[in-house]
């Protein structure tokens, strides 16, 4: 890291102590060319200081950041925050991101959010050629199906077609 990056890191940590989610939103909206460590650090901190107002910034990171690691952390943080407003971006990443770790984490995040509307898209992701992505989508599908059954009191749902 450059010397000025350490100062930026201190500023991020100060904003974290103040629980200033808006600082992180502003930072992420202008961070594309900053070092990976700073971008990932900011995304991870939002899990602890963010509320629904940070979702759109995290969704932009998930879609546009050049690093799969940063996009993965954005998906993780969106899942931990748990807002349904992130579902569309997570579905898009799960089905279309070039990186398997991003697709995997997006499926896991959808499970964490618990929105049954993601079930059809998870069923598509079960067919992913990457085994980890496919398994993550299947686990998420099973969990959301379980939630649906419990909410409706139903006993059975159609199982997705699983490639063996």
Name every feature range the model reports, one short phrase each.
Residues 130-141, 153-154:
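Solenoidal tandem-repeat scaffolds enriched in leucines and small polar residues
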Residues 8-11, 42, 74, 106, ...:
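Conserved hydrophobic register position within alpha-solenoid helical repeats
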């Amino acid at each position: 890291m450059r010397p000025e990056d350490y100062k930026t890191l201190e500023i991020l940590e100060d904003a974290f102590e103040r629980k200033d989610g808006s600082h992180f939103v502003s930072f992420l909206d202008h961070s594309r060319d900053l070092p990976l460590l700073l971008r990932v650090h900011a995304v991870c901190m939002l899990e602890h200081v963010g509320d629904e107002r940070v979702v759109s910034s995290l969704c932009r990171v998930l879609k546009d950041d050049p690093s799969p690691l940063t996009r993965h952390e954005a998906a993780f943080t969106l899942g931990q925050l748990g807002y349904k407003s992130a579902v569309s971006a997570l579905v898009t990443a799960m089905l279309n991101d070039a990186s398997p770790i991003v697709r995997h984490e997006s499926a896991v995040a959808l499970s964490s959010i618990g929105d049954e509307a993601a079930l059809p898209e998870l069923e598509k992701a079960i067919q992913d050629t990457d085994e980890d992505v496919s398994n993550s989508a299947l686990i998420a599908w099973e969990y959301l199906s379980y939630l649906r059954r419990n909410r409706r009191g139903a006993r059975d749902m159609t199982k997705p077609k699983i490639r063996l």
